UniProtKB/Swiss-Prot annotation:
InterPro entries: Cyt_c_assembly, Cyt_c_biogenesis, Cyt_c_biogenesis_plant
GO cellular component: membrane; mitochondrion
Protein function: Could be involved in assembly and maturation of cytochromes c. May play a role in guidance of apocytochromes and heme groups for the covalent linkage introduced by the cytochrome-c-heme lyase.
Listed name of the protein: Probable cytochrome c biosynthesis protein
A Pfam family per the record: Cytochrom_C_asm
GO process annotations (BP): cytochrome complex assembly
Record organism: Oenothera berteroana
Length: 577
């Protein structure tokens, strides 16, 4: 085996390491191994260009001086995709090393953490798994009705729908009503037992569903999953349709073609890596936003948080000064319009039965809310949480859920701000260098009638500029997540347009329609997943706003109860079950 083949197989080694590294090691360990393996493959391609190894097809068709031989490594389709993968693996390593997740060891609930690419690979092998169902049904085996990805999706859907009990899917598992109870799910008709012992390895397809505490500790791993999942796709795309170590079937001592003289420019040699670095940084921001949406959808409606919120609201009602005993959470979690069916609050005291008195006090309660008597307390508490990112576990006494303030803390949106600034800076440098090249190579008109391929990098720059103005806000809004997602999707769309033949240019890579099909499917997949997650997040946000309206009415009643208690300290009958 030659040294060139060793460089070729190092890319396979990087993918293998990402799957099978020891789970007792931190996630940065596996990301570092994948980074060094891809770097070795990239250095091998660079060595082929520098040494004029004419056995490689890309070297044979791109003869140039020494400096442009180095830049010729990424001046073709195969080398540019390999550079993309290497930068993405490097960014993933930085994310792992900076995050330093502390929950990489064995879980207390049993089972090891999943591998980096586990959930992402299931998207690609889902069709293959479903194709096995026909074979199992023909052989009279128990059919597997659901893939792990579908099961995990149903688990999250069950957690989101625990409030209204409107889950229409199969009852795969029952979510616990209390945090101390374990929750798990298994395959329908699975023949392997689930290992429930602590510290033992659990079969991947029969893993335990995590509660809110364990889900919060795995946020860092979910961020890394998305980044290395994108690297996985581009690696498979590179090996399937864009092999960068294509060998010639004949011996040749001299190159057959020269590199395009228009591309032999020192500015244009530095321009592509800057554009790729900016595009890959947008991919990291996309992964962070995807992780935030996936965790936010489940966290806002998990049963333990609803129980904690109910207890806090009950203590708030007790502190109003009109209740002499503790109110249970089951009583307060009922809808406010149904409270009157089971209890008689202080609104029905004998001294307060006058409709005019009720109307006057209700108006007085709403006026207090309008002036900020109760809302200001929640705002000040939220400001303290947002300004101090380290204390992200603090919650407002008037918040509707225990996890509402932790979602919008500065500590959570700091990585998004860093990566979107990185994307914007690299795109700035790349676009300025490309504009300079177009000016002195194509004339003054080249500055305005720019190359259409370079315009593909201008769309992400505009969106990144808009995202910078949105991410500097103290709270992380949904528009920030949407702009981050669309920025990465524009990068993928620009890559597809360049490498599929939609845009004709001097340095386009349109040589095969198969590459465009791969990239188009990847673009549709990322767009579909992003829109589904974003729509679910907005749906949960609308439920939250509806619940907040109910809480406004409840808090106004608390103000009325306080004044009623002052008017009559000892009521005859306050609550009746």
């Amino acid at each position: 085996m030659s040294i060139v083949e060793l460089f070729h197989y190092s890319l396979f080694l990087g993918l293998f390491v990402a799957f099978t590294y020891n789970k007792k090691e931190p996630p940065a360990f596996g990301a570092a191994l994948a980074f060094w393996c891809i770097l070795l493959s990239f250095l091998g391609l660079l060595f082929c260009h520098i040494s004029n190894n004419n056995s490689n097809y890309n070297v044979l068709t791109a003869n140039a001086p020494f400096f442009y031989q180095i830049s010729g490594t990424w001046s073709n389709h195969e080398g540019s995709i390999l550079l993309w993968c290497w930068i993405l693996s490097f960014y993933g390593f930085l994310l792992c090393y900076r995050g330093r997740p502390q929950s990489h060891n064995v879980s207390k609930r049993g089972g090891y953490r999943e591998t980096f690419f586990y959930f992402f690979v299931l998207n690609f092998v889902k069709n293959f798994i479903l194709s096995l169902l026909c074979y199992e049904q023909k052989t009279l085996a128990v059919p597997q009705l659901y893939t792990p990805f579908v099961l995990r999706t149903l688990v999250d859907s069950e957690l989101c729908s625990r409030r209204n009990r409107t889950f229409d899917g199969p009852a795969l598992f029952y979510a616990p009503l209390y945090p101390e109870r374990k929750m798990s799910f298994a395959f329908l008709g699975a023949r392997l037992p689930v290992v429930r012992g602590e510290g033992k390895r659990t079969y991947l397809l029969l893993h335990l569903a995590r509660d809110d505490k364990e889900r919060a500790s795995s946020i860092d791993e979910q961020r890394i999953d998305g980044a290395l999942g994108i690297a996985l796709f581009f690696s498979f795309f590179l090996l399937a349709s864009s092999d960068f170590f294509v060998r010639n079937f004949f011996v040749c001592t001299e190159p057959l073609a020269e590199l395009n003289p228009v591309l032999q420019d020192p500015i244009l040699a530095i321009h592509p890596p800057c554009i790729y670095a900016g595009d890959v940084a947008s991919a990291m921001g996309f992964c962070l936003c995807r992780s935030k949406m996936m965790n936010g959808i489940v966290a806002l409606h998990s049963p333990p948080m609803w129980k904690d919120a109910a207890e806090k609201n009950g203590r708030l009602l007790c502190s109003a000064g009109c209740v002499g005993f503790r109110i249970t959470s089951e009583l307060f979690t009922l809808k406010f319009k149904d409270v009157g069916a089971k209890c008689y609050p202080a609104l029905l005291l004998r001294s307060n039965r006058s409709p005019l008195m009720l109307l006057r006090r209700r108006f007085f309660a709403f006026s207090l809310l309008w002036t900020g008597a109760l809302v200001d307390t929640g705002r000040e508490q939220a400001k303290r949480v947002v300004r101090n990112g380290k204390k992200d576990t603090a919650t407002s006494p008037l918040s509707w859920t225990a996890g509402a303030n932790t979602v919008v803390s500065d500590q959570d949106q700091e990585p998004i701000r860093i990566w979107i600034l990185t994307c914007w800076c690299f795109l700035n440098v790349g676009i300025l260098l490309g504009s300079w090249w177009a000016y002195h190579e194509l004339g003054w008109g080249g500055w305005w009638f720019w190359d259409p391929v370079e315009n593909a990098s201008f769309m992400p720059w505009v969106l990144a500029t808009a995202c910078i103005h949105s991410v500097i806000l103290p709270l992380l809004h949904s528009c920030t997540l949407l702009i981050n997602i669309v920025t990465f999707l524009c990068c993928v769309l620009g890559t597809f347009s360049i490498r599929s033949g939609l845009l004709a240019s001097v340095h386009s890579f349109a040589t095969d329609d198969t590459r465009g099909i791969f990239l188009w499917r990847f673009f549709l997949l990322m767009t579909g997943i992003s829109m589904i997650l974003f729509s679910q997040m907005k749906q949960q946000a609308s439920v939250r706003r509806t619940y907040q309206k109910e809480m406004v009415v409840a808090r106004s009643t608390l103000v009325h109860l306080r004044h009623s208690a002052r008017a009559q300290p000892r009521p005859q009958l306050l609550w009746k079950n």
